[in-house]
Amino acid sequence: MRIEEDIKLGFKDVLIRPKRSILKSRSQVNLARCFSFKYSASIWSGIPIIAANMDTIGTFEMVKSLSKFNILTAVHKYYSFEEWKNFVCLSSKEILNHVIVSIGTSNIDFLKIKKIFLLSSELKYICIDVANGYSEHIVSFLKLVRDYFPDKIICAGNVVTGEMVEELILSGADIVKVGIGPGSVCTTRVKTGVGYPQLSAIIECADAAHGLNGQIISDGGCTVSGDIAKAFGGGADFVMLGGMLSGHKECSGDIIEEKSKKYMIFYGMSSVSAMQRYEGKIAGYRASEGKTVKIPFRGSVDSTIRDILGGLRSSCTYVGAEKLKELTKRTTFIRVTEQENCIFNAFKE
């Protein structure tokens, strides 16, 4: 047993210090990024936000809406091959270029993804989707996928420490997904006692990845656009959103009505709801590590995305970053004990 004495930080523990700026308007800020990758020869450009590969969020409908903003969607792994076939046949090149195909680590998953990628050469991204990226099994599976798909952009995770980021990149990952337990419907940290505050995980993992010409995705923990800015400021190349995109018509799940108000169900992928839906039961050796909540129905995701991007542009303006790429080097975090004045929060409509 050992104890690390350094205090690790989450988004709520810091604010970004404002700095002198020559920008006159938020409209001058360019949020697009352009990345080359360690293994794939592809070049990616767009806004580096990704809809999470949760079954309620990473839907084909979400792909169609977010592609208009040049934003990626990690499509969940529970669609059948026939559903993929129908989607690919009916989708344009522009839409397919914004799809990340998520898979598990079983032989069935590997056979399925081989069939999916035969449907179109416009599919370029793979996400190996497991909760615990520290397993030897994911490393061996990642090597298998990289050998079979040498030209695809592959991300793998989830991890929260630099040494495992390095291991995954050296095993074939272009991008590593960072985050254990920060999600809005994740209870891993309280159920297992395992995790890592997200901002510190980003800072440490980004340093490890960038030293090997890799990238990271910050996955989880963002509740407002300011958190997204902090993730980019800490060194994240991409930010993945789940809860912030929940409750929209592009999400899967039924709309329920109670007392004249509409809601959608949102749950973690290790929750009782998810396990019963896809496995029919909770395995005797498992415990739920997620929660199920009702989210007020919010209509189209378009207005939420515009609000997020507007907040991100404003963050850049406050520190003088004309491009999102400049935000990290323009960021100075200050430790704080408060984030906002909450006196009237109870009166919000």
Swiss-Prot record:
Q: Which residues pair up as cystines?
A: none
**CDD domains documented for this protein:** IMPDH (cd00381)
Which keywords does this Swiss-Prot/TrEMBL entry list? Answer: Metal-binding, NADP, Oxidoreductase, Potassium
User: Where are the membrane-spanning stretches?
Assistant: none
The free-text function statement in the UniProt record for this protein reads: Catalyzes the irreversible NADPH-dependent deamination of GMP to IMP. It functions in the conversion of nucleobase, nucleoside and nucleotide derivatives of G to A nucleotides, and in maintaining the intracellular balance of A and G nucleotides.
The family database entries (NCBIfam families) matched by this protein are listed as:
GMP_reduct_1, PRK05096.1
What is the name of the protein in this document?
GMP reductase
Q: Which gene encodes it?
A: guaC
